[in-house]
A protein has these predicted regions:
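RNA-contacting regions in translation and RNA-metabolism proteins
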Residues: 1-55, 68-92
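An amphipathic, aromatic/His-enriched active-site/gating alpha helix that lines ligand/cofactor pockets
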Residues: 65
C-alpha cells in the first residue's frame, strides 16, 4: 500500500526537491509547481502538478522534456536501488 511523503528517506526527499527545482526553472508560474511523492514498496511515484498554462513546458515538444526528467529520475533511482516514476497531472 502507498504511504505519504513523510515516510520518504532523506535521499528520496532530495530527489523530490530536485524535481521541484527543475520544474520551477522550466515554467512561467513557479508558484504553481507542486510535487507529491507517493511511496510504494519498490517504486516512488512523483506526481507533478503545474499551472495549466505551464503544462506544455514540463512535457516539451513530443514529450522530450518529460522524457529527460524521467531519465534523471531513473539514474537517481539506480543509485538508491529504488524506482521513481513521474506522473504529470493536468487540471481536471
Amino acid at each position: 500500500m502507498a504511504s505519504p511523503t513523510s515516510n520518504l528517506s532523506r535521499k528520496e526527499l532530495a530527489i523530490k526537491d530536485l524535481l521541484t527545482e527543475i520544474a520551477k526553472a522550466l515554467v512561467d508560474h513557479p508558484e504553481g509547481v507542486q510535487v507529491r511523492a507517493v511511496e510504494g514498496s519498490h517504486v516512488t511515484v512523483l506526481e507533478l502538478k503545474t499551472h495549466p498554462e505551464d503544462l506544455g513546458k514540463v512535457i516539451g515538444r513530443e514529450g522530450r522534456i518529460a522524457k529527460a526528467i524521467r531519465t534523471l529520475l531513473g539514474a537517481a533511482g539506480m543509485k538508491l536501488h529504488k524506482r521513481f516514476t513521474l506522473e504529470i497531472l493536468d487540471e481536471d
